[in-house]
Every structure is written in C-alpha cells, then in structure tokens.
C-alpha cells in the first residue's frame, strides 16, 4: 500500500471473492473480517475527498435497496474514523469485479458474511492531511 498513489484504488473483500482471479496483487488477511481490515487500513490510508464516491460497496443481487450486515459495519468503521458523512455507492456484482480488477491491490479477508466487499480510493498524504 505504501507504493499506492493518489487516486489508486484498494479492494477489501470477503473470503468468497475471486481475489486470485481478479486481483493483480492479492494481500491475504485470513484472520480478520472485512470491517476489522478496513479499520486497520484507515489508520494509514487517507480517502480521496475530491472524488464522489471514494467508497464503493457491492450491491445485493436482486435487492439493490438492501444494506447487508458488512456494509452496516463498514459505515460504523467509517464513522469511527470521522468519515461517516462521506458518500458511498453500491455497484452491481460484475461492475465491482471490474473495479477490483483495476485496483492496485485486493485485500482478501476471512470475512464469511456475503457482500463483505468495499473499494477505497486513496487520497493525498501531506502535511495538511491529518491521518485518522
């Protein structure tokens, strides 16, 4: 992640996500669920506040208005980092796969709940950007 630049994307995905097929670089975190991984990553990863949205999740197939438990947990983590007002959007499954394919890296977690996937757009690290 240190090699990532402004605008690069990072996918944090569940254990059932086809990370090896989709990801250029796969980071395995089998001992952490996706919200825990997100929480840790946000301590060193500023989100891009110049794009809307900088956070993308995966839409529930057949029910685009549903909010799965992992997404509720992602929102709680974002709120805990002072990012609760940040807009985010859900992508359809294959659109999420395409974005993950273009991501700098895919972090495959041990998350077993469905739809435990989130994409982050990296912001700028500078002396004016407080790290969460």
Can you describe what each PLM-predicted range is?
Residues 26-42, 131:
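Gly/Ser/Thr-rich active-site loops/lids in small-molecule metabolic enzymes
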Residues 47-73:
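Ordered, amphipathic secondary-structure segments that act as subunit-interaction surfaces
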